[in-house]
Amino acid sequence: MDLKKAALDYHLFPKPGKLSVESSKPCLTQQDLSLAYTPGVAEPVKEIHKDPSNAYKYTNKGNLIAVITNGTAVLGLGNMGALASKPVMEGKAVLFKRFADIDVFDIEINAKTSDEFIQTVVNIAPTFGGINLEDIAAPECFYIEKELKKKLDIPVFHDDQHGTAVVVAAGLINALEIQSKKLEEVKIVFLGAGAAGCSCARLLKSMGARNIIMVDRQGVLDKNRSNLHEINIDLAIEPSAIKTLDDAMQDADVFIGVSAA
């Protein structure tokens, strides 16, 4: 099978894209439409105005997630821009719907700065019951997530961090059990120190892992490196002779690859 052709055809036919919007209420008669829109729609508007929590009662807010990106870290492709990231965001929406029956709007934001991105999300947040951040480059992603959690009253989840970390932790627990090894005793090497790698390592540390070495394209993260951000520094080892991936892999028990390199 020609994978490229199959993937492009899948996205093109029978109509472009992977998502559509369907009504959850009957809209066949004049009476239906007068309830769906004016004049009937004014009644839930007034109820929500009196008590904002009624939005969860009379609208789809409680089952609607925003999958949001700026396209700066798309899959292993890098900074592809907001528009080119749309197929991935639609794909994540499909997963939400297929496996949890949660509705999604995919939103791709052209933002020049992290603060501009944050403000855009804050401005549209009333529509949604939760925010799923996706494919945002590190270290900006850490700041964006932290600020949105401060500003919003709905859940904020960065999939590349937390989704990956949960899956990696679950897999490692099972693998270590099969090998009769303990998390606090094994040597773990990460290739990749971006959003996914850092989040995985932080979760494993919180679970008891003590010997973790992070490696990125410039080598081992140690505290002598001047180009580390605050999350990297927290995971960096003390300066030593361990400088490369080959060095780090000596006597390693676990290798976790979270890099396109």
What does each model-identified segment do?
Residues M1-V156:
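N-terminal ligand-binding/catalytic initiation module
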Residues E22-C27, D106, N110, E177, ...:
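Short, exposed beta-strand "edge-strand" segments with a Pro/Gly-rich flavor and a Y/T-containing core
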Residues P26, N110, A137, Q161, ...:
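Short beta->alpha junction loops/turns
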Residues H49-N54, S199-C200, S240-I242, A261:
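Glycine-rich, charged/polar anion/phosphate-binding loops
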Residues L75, A82-A100, H158, H162, ...:
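Glycine-rich phosphate/diphosphate-binding loop of Rossmann-like nucleotide-binding domains
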Residues P139-F142, C198, V258:
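Transmembrane alpha-helical segments of multi-pass membrane transport proteins and ion-pumping complexes
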